[in-house]
UniProtKB/Swiss-Prot annotation:
SUPFAM superfamilies: PLP-dependent transferases. Its EC number is 2.6.1.9. It catalyses: L-histidinol phosphate + 2-oxoglutarate = 3-(imidazol-4-yl)-2-oxopropyl phosphate + L-glutamate. One of its GO terms (biological process) is L-histidine biosynthetic process. This is Histidinol-phosphate aminotransferase. NCBIfam families: hisC. It is an enzyme of class 2 (transferase). HAMAP family: HisC_aminotrans_2. The gene is hisC.
Amino acid sequence: MKWKKSLTGLSSYKPGKREEEVMAELGLTKITKLSSNENPLGTSPKVAELQANSSVETEIYPDGWASSLRTVVADFYQLEEEELIFTAGVDELIELLTRVLLDTTKNTVMATPTFVQYRQNALIEGAEVREIPLLVDGAHDLDGMLNAIDDNTTIVWVCNPNNPTGNYIDLADIQAFLDKVPSDVLVVLDEAYIEYVTPQPEKHEKLIRTYKNLIITRTFSKIYGLASARVGYGIADKAIIEQLNIVRPPFNTTSIGQKLAIEAIKDQAFIEACRTSNANGIKQYEAFAKRFEQVKLYPANGNFVLIDLGIEAGTIFSYLEKNGYITRSGAALGFPTAVRITIGKEEENSAVIALLEKLL
């Protein structure tokens, strides 16, 4: 086959191990998955009720415009419906962005380490990837990213909070950054974990009307607990949305996914409960880190913590796995002596911390 040359050297995305796989390998009867940043509290009771009582006409194509969901989300953020695009998770939106803006003559700027799909999709399009190392505390080097922009730059990626470090850039710094980015360079502000930030930042969706080169990406996969429903969305100027819709598949979000997302966003009481539970979980890990001088905990603002124990990452990962907890080794994330752990329920956090204390 005459494959694209840009695929040479690339490999497919490797998701975390499945619970069943680990249990079979290690002979365990119970496993807790804390590797994919899923919501340990599940999803809204209203979503569960809809799932139990909903019937889907599987022979009928879904609404390609996601009309009902579009109206609800637009009302929620006080936006115009044409300022939104819905995709099969943010993953698909990232793919669409690289497809419309990158080719072999262009380059893109991002932090490293950050969410791996920015780089992967850029390389598939044959673009040059300019990676700017994070600062020592895990924060974006925004000045370094600005300096990397040139006439051939078309996209700058900012993951906020950043995955895998958890660092959060406040709104004032984001605006100062946007003020300096050329108006013909798209800034992707990936806010997959924004609902977990405590306290919640000031509403800033309407920044897209000041910065016509900004797209904000969000998802129903994280705090809303709809990871398997695959519903993400982008907020941007209408001109950006129009270009993305040219390459967006016509029926890319499912009927049931759209319905579940509507119920999920309506139940903000559940979201607040998830945010509070998550903040308490972060405090558990912060207290643990304070007890051990050799432990470095990166600033946590998502639903995960990145912990450097000064021990080889594979050793930490295997140790926790053998004791019934799947985490994410930092080795593949650019942190050879760290692990990324999804914040779980209080008792799950306590159990993991107790295991880490024994390891130290």
